[in-house]
Amino acid sequence: MNELTLIDFYLCFLAFLLFLVLIMLLIFWFSLEIQDIEEPCNKV
């Protein structure tokens, strides 16, 4: 039982880390999009 609970805890921890990374990537992409919108369109 201890091994199963350890594996479950490890999987939950990995899922939590993946969730945090996804949120950070979304915030980073969103900030880049806002900067592109605020700046005048020089890239044509």
Swiss-Prot record:
Predominant cellular place of this UniProt entry's protein: host cell
Localization, UniProt: Host membrane
Pfam family, one: bCoV_NS7B
Entry's transmembrane regions: 9-29
Membrane topology note: Single-pass membrane protein
Keyword vocabulary terms for this entry: Host membrane, Membrane, Transmembrane, Transmembrane helix
InterPro entries from the UniProt entry: NS7B_bCoV, ORF7b_SARS-CoV-like
CDD domains attached to this UniProt entry: ORF7b_SARS-CoV-like
GO cellular component: host cell membrane; membrane
Keyword Transmembrane helix assigned: yes
Domain of life, per lineage: Viruses
Additional note from the record: Bat coronavirus HKU3 is highly similar to SARS-CoV (SARS-like).
Protein name per UniProt: Non-structural protein 7b
Biological source species: Bat coronavirus HKU3 (BtCoV)
Lineage, highest ranks first: Viruses, Riboviria, Orthornavirae, Pisuviricota, Pisoniviricetes
